Amino acid sequence: MRKSFGVFLLLATVVFACTHEPFFSLDNEMQELIGDLNRYVLPESDDLASIPQSPANPLTPEKVNLGKMLFFEPGFGVEAMHPEGMQTFSCGSCHIPAAGFRPNRMQGIADGGVGFGLNGEARDKYPGYAASEIDAQGARPLSVLNVAFVSNTMWNGSFGSGGVNIGTEHRWGVADPGTAINHEQLGALEGQNIEGLKVHRLLYNRELVEANGYKA
């Protein structure tokens, strides 16, 4: 009995001795790295003054409402590879709200795609298009959610004259001709969208704007 009690006492001592002290130093280090948590709180959608924007193109409620319509407007998809694809695609073809503003399938298809389903899951290659003719990017489209807070856009951060691209001016427009737009000192998102219109076979001009009812 005395031996059993001794073993129990020894085990109890070992257990309590192994109790870890709180990692206060690690917590402090994490807090320093994170900084002020308030900087991670996004502003309300109508608090336009708190959303990053280009001074040359400030946000207004009218521009926001226009953008919401243009995002899903297929009327400007007139640079299609084949007549069958004319005006059958928009930004919303590949950036699906219900899918986090990304494709709801393995890859998004703009021009050269057909169908949609409920949330983009049924879009597929149009039979009349060769695989090499469809507008599908080499990498999955990024989400366009909250991209106003992104200083450099695209997977490799190639668009935008600020942020990580400061000091890389000599490379703009060299390996990727589209990045020459960075020399215009536009916001990353604006520069990418201007080039994106060409890449995604969209065209905006006065005639189409009026024809689609966006200007009286």
For the regions a language model picked out, list residue spans one by one.
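Periplasmic c-type cytochrome electron-transfer domains
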Residues: 18-216
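Bacterial Sec-dependent N-terminal signal peptides
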Residues: 1-24
